[in-house]
Regions:
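An acidic, low-aromatic, low-complexity terminal/linker signal
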Residues: 1-171
Length: 171
């Protein structure tokens, strides 16, 4: 009797499965990015790399370093180098304003590094289908080597930064 009931339940379960050839829903991975502004361009930074976002504060200059390395800050007892992402990417000099922020990134063995950005705009979610791995004409030539992909957020294009290219080395 119990065997017959199990067979009936299995039969009912099988009836609910999609038939061969039926469309099945494909689950896409969702990624979160913080959208920043540098000049007239919008860039996305994977939220997993972000440790902190700070208002602009005093940066202590360090002598004999590349121009893009603005100096260091002290964050809860940790000395963190701060670089100008604009200068590193070959864009115009920084324009420090009330929206300027220092984003503390967690980058591999280098530890934490701060980057100056003109503005932190928003947090967005993008799926695989919204991210194009080829970088087109929407990214300035100076920025291309720092961009790994382009995301489509509604009508807005977001250049996704490749954080492996944003290091403290002089290249």
């Amino acid at each position: 009797m119990a065997e017959r009931q199990v067979n009936m339940e299995l039969s009912n379960d099988l009836k609910n499965l999609p038939a061969s050839g039926d469309e099945t829903k494909i689950v896409q991975e969702v990624y979160q990015f913080i959208v920043i502004r540098l000049g007239d361009e919008n860039f996305g930074i994977d939220i997993n790399y972000i440790d902190n976002i700070l208002r602009m504060q005093q940066i202590t200059r360090v002598p004999k370093v590349p121009a893009y390395l603005k100096g260091v800050i002290n964050l809860r007892g940790e000395v963190i180098p701060v670089m100008s992402l604009r200068i590193k990417m070959g864009l115009s000099d920084d324009e420090i304003g009330r929206d300027t922020r220092i984003i503390i990134l967690k980058i591999g063995e280098e530890g934490n590094v701060g980057i100056l950005v003109d503005e932190v705009r928003e947090v967005i979610k993008l799926t695989d289908s919204q991210i194009e791995s080829t970088v087109g004409d929407n990214v300035s030539p100076e920025s291309r080597r720092f961009v790994s992909a382009v995301g489509q957020n509604g009508e807005q294009l977001i250049s996704i930064l490749d954080l492996t290219t944003i290091n403290l080395d002089d290249n």
